[in-house]
Amino acid sequence: MKLHTLVSCLHDFPVVPKENPEITSIEADSRKVKEGSLFVCMKGYTVDSHDFAKQAAAQGAAAIVAERPIDVDVPVVLVKNTFRSLAVLADYFYGQPTHKLHLIGITGTNGKTTTSHIMDEIMRAHGHKTGLIGTINMKIGDETFEVKNTTPDALTLQQTFAKMVEHGVDSTVMEVSSHALDLGRVHGCDYDVAVFTNLTQDHLDYHKTMEEYKHAKGLLFAQLGNSYNHNREKYAVLNNDDAVTVEYMRSTAATVVTYGIDTTSDVMAKDIAMTSGGTTFTLVTPYESVNVTMKLIGKFNVYNVLAATAAGLVSGVSLETIIDVIKELAGVPGRFEVVDGGQNYTVIVDYAHTPDSLENVLKTAKQFAKGDVYCIVGCGGDRDRTKRPIMASVATQYATHAIYTSDNPRSEDPAAILDDMVHGANGNNYEVIIDRKEAIHHAITKAKADDIIIIAGKGHETYQIIGKDVHHFDDREVAKEAITERLNNEE
């Protein structure tokens, strides 16, 4: 593709050189540049790849996209924002693949992963070959791939969409992070349905204020309706029980469909009842009301199911098909996942890493707890410090016993992180055990029959980051090991 043809997709008045070389690939990593590449420079938090433009040119880059003039011997296209330009260029270069997909984007603080997995099951049941992009993994049909970020970088994203189309995928569900929205990674993505789960405190290390965080999430809905294909109706599926929804309603040109429990909505749940074996409720839609029994536990999971139901209905899936899927849902790895080693107490691993999600998980556990509730929780290093005392407060408020431990301390001193947490403790029903493995073994050793142990924060993760080192660590494996050890000692 010629350079002039490629950059014609940019509509923010780029400064385009007269030269018109052939572009054979797009790269954002100078180390991957080869003959014919278009190298896009981006200024990150720690590295500014404008500094590697000469290296890219020396490696054969045919042209460079930058935010400032660069002294190189190849054509330079000047743009206002290279992050967003990369997304649009990648979309165009790979044939605008999302135009060929029914694309569903899910954003919010909590519930994205579970909702996306439910939605994927619903679309499969409707006969679609599906793609899935999210926190746990990426799927193309029945193939599964590991991921580094909730939402990949713009280049990887468009390459993935193109691969999905090539493999016959016609419907894709993806989690859309606030970082991806703020950095413009999803510019060029033609969403058909955008889903909002909820907004609570998280990522303030990046966004600085809740107002900025709210704005970033809202970009998905503000951009929805600016369709590349005017024959496709666009839908914003919004949680009517969240106060932010009113603002998102005003910001979108798409058709709004609401769901909720406490506020009158298009799709609702009533008469919710929970046991340790599942949840029952009445699903109310504009068409009919249906009694639902599902294996998933918790009010938060009812919200996830409502979001997926509303998104499924606007995607043309019958209510009957949706109900059949809900009844068989087995849960998502690391989301209220029970670790069963034959013990007489319950061990649950959950990804809850925000105050709101931790509160929801602990409240749910207390609803069917016959004994004490233990909560093992930590907070990530190099991340939002303001939520540390709040997380600690939630743990002591809703658990009988709280154990503060390490999560992914990264470059921070684990003891300093825990000190931040202790400042939020309510009462004295907590203890501090820095080593996460030791903390899990300690709780499992102390638990009595019918107690519940919640191991929060890491969920599906199979690693722990200490300093710059990434160690294998899986809460589920450690818990199973501790359960087995205790059972063997009791024989």
From Swiss-Prot:
SUPFAM superfamilies (alphabetical): MurD-like peptide ligases, catalytic domain, MurD-like peptide ligases, peptide-binding domain, MurE/MurF N-terminal domain
Residues that bind meso-2,6-diaminopimelate: 383, 407-410, 457, 461
Subcellular location as annotated: Cytoplasm
GO biological process, one term: regulation of cell shape
List of residues that carry N6-carboxylysine: 217
Principal location listed in the UniProt entry: cytoplasm
Protein's pathway: Cell wall biogenesis; peptidoglycan biosynthesis
GO molecular function: ATP binding; magnesium ion binding; UDP-N-acetylmuramoylalanyl-D-glutamate-2,6-diaminopimelate ligase activity
GO cellular component, one term: cytoplasm
Enzyme category, top tier: ligase
Cofactor dependency: Mg(2+)
Binding site for UDP-N-acetyl-alpha-D-muramoyl-L-alanyl-D-glutamate: 30, 149-151, 177, 185
Role description: Catalyzes the addition of meso-diaminopimelic acid to the nucleotide precursor UDP-N-acetylmuramoyl-L-alanyl-D-glutamate (UMAG) in the biosynthesis of bacterial cell-wall peptidoglycan.
Xref: PANTHER family: MUR LIGASE FAMILY MEMBER (PTHR23135), UDP-N-ACETYLMURAMOYL-L-ALANYL-D-GLUTAMATE--2,6-DIAMINOPIMELATE LIGASE MURE HOMOLOG, CHLOROPLASTIC (PTHR23135:SF4)
NCBIfam families registered for this protein in UniProt: murE, PRK00139.1-2, PRK00139.1-4
The protein's name in its UniProt record: UDP-N-acetylmuramoyl-L-alanyl-D-glutamate--2,6-diaminopimelate ligase
